[in-house]
C-alpha cells in the first residue's frame, strides 16, 4: 500500500470526528435551559418547601439532586438516572410530573434534560453570584482586524462560526451610530460633513469626547437608570395624582454628566440624608426612596401599605443593585436562588427609618399631592442665575459700603427683587429624612396581619457573608 494513501486513511477517523464535533449542538446551558424546566415542572414537589416536598428529594440543590444514594441524577449515565427513567416511562403511575399536577414535559424539554444528563449534568450558579475572572485572549486568524482586546473576543466568535467580520462602516454611518449611541439624537447639521472631510481615528476620538461632554449624554444614560428605579411623576394608583420628584431626574442626569463614581451614586440615593453635612444634591438623591406606588386614599390601612412599600423597596434594590429577584422570598424561600424570607425582611429593615407613616398621614389627594418631607430647589440654569445675582449683589453692597450712593441703593433693591422672584420659581421635590426605625418582623407568607414572625435586624443575604463595620 502506498505510504501516503495509508497515512490519509489513518487520519480519516480524526477528520470525521472533527467534522462531527463541529455539527454538534452547543452544550446544554443549565441556567438558561435546565433550571427553568426544573423550577416550573419539578420544584413544587421536589423543591425548597418542606411541607410539600415528596420522596425526600430536592432537585433545587445540586448536592441533593446528585446524591448517589437516591440516583435521581447520575452524571453521564442516562439509563441509571431515575429522573430520566421517570420522565420517559409509559407507566402513568410512575411518570413524572404526575398527571394530577396538571403539568407535563414537552418532547423538547425531555430531550434537553436527557442531553444535559448525558453531558455530565453540569450545574451552574446564578451568573450574579459567580466572581468575574480574567479570560485568556482567543487566538484569531485576522490579527490585524482587532483594535482592542475586546475585539479579539468578538472576532474569535465570528471566526468560530465560520463567518467574516462586516466591512468597516462608512463615515456617514459611523457618525450617525456614535450620535445615537451616546446622545440618543441624530447628528446636528454639519457634523456629518465635517467628519466626512476628515474621517481619521483622531477625528473620531475627538467626536466621541465631544459627545461624552454633552449634556445629552447624561440624558441618554439617565433614561436607562430612571426606568430601572421606576421613576414617575405620578403616584401610580387609580387616581394617579401628580407628585413632585423631577429634581431627582435632573440629579441623575447631572451625575452621569459629572462621572459621579458608582459607589457614591449608590450611597447618595440609598442614604444621602445620613451623610455628614448632607448637601442639597445628596438630599435630592434620596428621592429614590420615595419612587414607588403610593396611595393617599382616606381609607387605606397604614400597616398594610407600609408592608407593601417595604417589599417594593427590597424588590427594586435587589433587582437594580444585585441583579437578582428577591420578590419570592417575601412569602417563602426562593425556589432556586439562595434567598430566604429572613434575607428579604433583613433587607427591608435597612429602610425601616424611612418615615412611611408620616408620608401616609400627610399625603392628600390634592393636585399636586403634598408629600412631606419636601424641599424647594432650583434647576441648573436657575442655580447659575442665582450665583450671578448673589455675586452682583455682593459687589454692589461692597461699593455701597465704600461710597454710598442712591443709584447703588436702587440697583441693589432691583437685584434683590429679581433674586426673590427667582426663588419663587423653585420646584418642590420629595426627599428622605431618617426617623426612628420601625420594628421589622418576618411576615409569615407575606401576611401583614400576622405579627408572629421573629424580629430581624438590617442585614444582607446570609450567603453573602457579613457587612464590614467600616471601623
Regions found by a protein language model. Give the residues of each.
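Electrostatic cytochrome c docking/interface patches
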Residues: 17-36, 98-103, 107, 139-143, ...
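Short, structured secondary-structure elements
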Residues: 59, 91-94, 98-100, 108-375, ...
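Local sequence-structure signature of Cys/Sec-based thiol-disulfide redox active-site neighborhoods
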Residues: 27-44, 51, 59, 320-325
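Mature extracytoplasmic enzyme cores
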Residues: 146, 151, 366-423, 427
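Coiled-coil termination/hinge junctions
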Residues: 409-451
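Bacterial N-terminal signal peptides
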Residues: 6-17
Amino acid at each position: 500500500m502506498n505510504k501516503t494513501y495509508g497515512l490519509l486513511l489513518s487520519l480519516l477517523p480524526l477528520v470525521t470526528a472533527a467534522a462531527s464535533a463541529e455539527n454538534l449542538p452547543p452544550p446544554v446551558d443549565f441556567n438558561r435551559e435546565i433550571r427553568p424546566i426544573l423550577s416550573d415542572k419539578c420544584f413544587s414537589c421536589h423543591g425548597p418547601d418542606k411541607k410539600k416536598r415528596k420522596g425526600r428529594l430536592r432537585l433545587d440543590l445540586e448536592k441533593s439532586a446528585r446524591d448517589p444514594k437516591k440516583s435521581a441524577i447520575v452524571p453521564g449515565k442516562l439509563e441509571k438516572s431515575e429522573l430520566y427513567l421517570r420522565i420517559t416511562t409509559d407507566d402513568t403511575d410512575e411518570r413524572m410530573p404526575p398527571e394530577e399536577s396538571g403539568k407535563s414535559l414537552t418532547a423538547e424539554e425531555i430531550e434537553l434534560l436527557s442531553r444535559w444528563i448525558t453531558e455530565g449534568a453540569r450545574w451552574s450558579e446564578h451568573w450574579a453570584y459567580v466572581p468575574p475572572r480574567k479570560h485568556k485572549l482567543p487566538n484569531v486568524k485576522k490579527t490585524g482586524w482587532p483594535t482592542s482586546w475586546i475585539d479579539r473576543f468578538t472576532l474569535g466568535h465570528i471566526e468560530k462560526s465560520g463567518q467574516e467580520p462586516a466591512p468597516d462602516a462608512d463615515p456617514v454611518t459611523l457618525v450617525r451610530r456614535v450620535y445615537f449611541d451616546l446622545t440618543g439624537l441624530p447628528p446636528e447639521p454639519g457634523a456629518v460633513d465635517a467628519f466626512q472631510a476628515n474621517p481619521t481615528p483622531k477625528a473620531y476620538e475627538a467626536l466621541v469626547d465631544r459627545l461624552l461632554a454633552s449634556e445629552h449624554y447624561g440624558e441618554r444614560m439617565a433614561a436607562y437608570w430612571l426606568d430601572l428605579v421606576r421613576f414617575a411623576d405620578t403616584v401610580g394608583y387609580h387616581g394617579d395624582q401628580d407628585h413632585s420628584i423631577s429634581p431627582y431626574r435632573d440629579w441623575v442626569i447631572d451625575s452621569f454628566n459629572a462621572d459621579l463614581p458608582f459607589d457614591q451614586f449608590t450611597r447618595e440615593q440609598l442614604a444621602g440624608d445620613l451623610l455628614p453635612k448632607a448637601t442639597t444634591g445628596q438630599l435630592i438623591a434620596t428621592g429614590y426612596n420615595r419612587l414607588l406606588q403610593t396611595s393617599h386614599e382616606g381609607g387605606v390601612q397604614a400597616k398594610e401599605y407600609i408592608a407593601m412599600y417595604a417589599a417594593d423597596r427590597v424588590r427594586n434594590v435587589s433587582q437594580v443593585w444585585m441583579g437578582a429577584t428577591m420578590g419570592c422570598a417575601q412569602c417563602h424561600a426562593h425556589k432556586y436562588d439562595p434567598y430566604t424570607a429572613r434575607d428579604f425582611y433583613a433587607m427591608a429593615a435597612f429602610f425601616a427609618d424611612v418615615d412611611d407613616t408620616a408620608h401616609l398621614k400627610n399625603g392628600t389627594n390634592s393636585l399636586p399631592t403634598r408629600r412631606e418631607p419636601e424641599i424647594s430647589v432650583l434647576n441648573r440654569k436657575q442655580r447659575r442665575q442665582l450665583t450671578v445675582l448673589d455675586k452682583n449683589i455682593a459687589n454692589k453692597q461692597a461699593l455701597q459700603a465704600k461710597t454710598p450712593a442712591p443709584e447703588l441703593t436702587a440697583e441693589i433693591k432691583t437685584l434683590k427683587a429679581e433674586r426673590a422672584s427667582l426663588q419663587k420659581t423653585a420646584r418642590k421635590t420629595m426627599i428622605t429624612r431618617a426617623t426612628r426605625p420601625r420594628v421589622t418582623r418576618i411576615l409569615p407568607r407575606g401576611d401583614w396581619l400576622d405579627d408572629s414572625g421573629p424580629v430581624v435586624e438590617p442585614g444582607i443575604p446570609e450567603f453573602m457573608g457579613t457587612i464590614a463595620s467600616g471601623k
